Each structure stands twice: as C-alpha cells, then as structure tokens.
Amino acid sequence: MPRALIDTTVLFAAAYRRDSSHETALPVIRGIDNGTLPGAVVLDYVLAETLNGLTTHAGHAAAVDLLDRIEENARFHIESLSTDAFATGKSLFRLHKPLSFVDACIVAYMQTEGLGYLYAFDDDFDAVDDIYRLDTATNPYDPS
C-alpha cells in the first residue's frame, strides 16, 4: 500500500478550526481516511508536536480526540525513527538551518525508508532534494 508522510502543519490545521490552513488540510485528511490518498505515516515526533499544539490552543480533550482518531484509523501509521534515521536527523538538523529538529527527523525517516512524498504546508522542505512536498489533496501515486 502506498504511503506518504504527513507533517504537523497539515495534521494540526485539520484538527484546529481556527488555523488559517484548516480548509486546505481537511481534504487531505479526508482523502487519507477514505482511501483516495495514500496512507499516512505519522512520526511520533510529529504526533507529539501536534498534540502539544492542540493542547495549548484547543485544550486537552481536543488533543485526546485526535490521538484516539489517529490510533483507531488503519490508514494512519504511527512510526518511530530507527537509530540510523535518528543519527541522520541530527546531522540534517546541523546542516540545514531552515529545518526544525522535527522537520530534519521527517526528512531522515523519508530518506532511510525510501519515501518521497510529504503532505506539508511548510515550504522549508522545498530546499531538500528528493522530498516532494504536497500542499493539497493530491494523490502522487495516481497519474490521472
């Protein structure tokens, strides 16, 4: 089954109605959920960042609701970095000033797992070779 990573910017925006990208993020999440888009890999770092942001802006109940929905949905896959990917993430963080540590870990995971597609609104990823950032509900595996 094809997969793509999902960044905090998309996950948070979909869950938080006041986010300026909420209406753009919803079709991405719905497409993942209904199978018109590839399954989503959610790194544990991304999940933590998203849940912390939701707790701050929308409250604990909203964060728990999102966590439950992600865990219960077979199209969302929570993954952790391997030791090698973590080492790569630290190196990328040191080398690429625009990337946050979580973003560097996303890139490292994608490189070590051979994944090229990332749903993200953060254009800092555009500076990284072999990462194809998707900012709309586009299926990169469907040529039609």
Across the structure, where does each feature detected by a protein language model lie?
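Acidic, PIN/NYN-like endoribonuclease modules and their adjacent C-terminal/linker elements
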Residues: 1-3, 112-144
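Glycine/small-residue-rich phosphate/adenosyl-binding loop
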Residues: 55-71
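Amphipathic alpha-helical segments within well-ordered protein domains
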Residues: 12, 51-52, 90
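Active-site neighborhoods of divalent-metal-dependent phosphate/nucleic-acid chemistry enzymes
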Residues: 78-117
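PIN/NYN-family metal-dependent endoribonuclease catalytic core
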Residues: 4-6, 27-57, 80
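Short active-site oxyanion
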Residues: 36-40, 75-77, 114-116
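Metal-dependent nucleic-acid phosphoesterase active-site entry motif
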Residues: 1-20
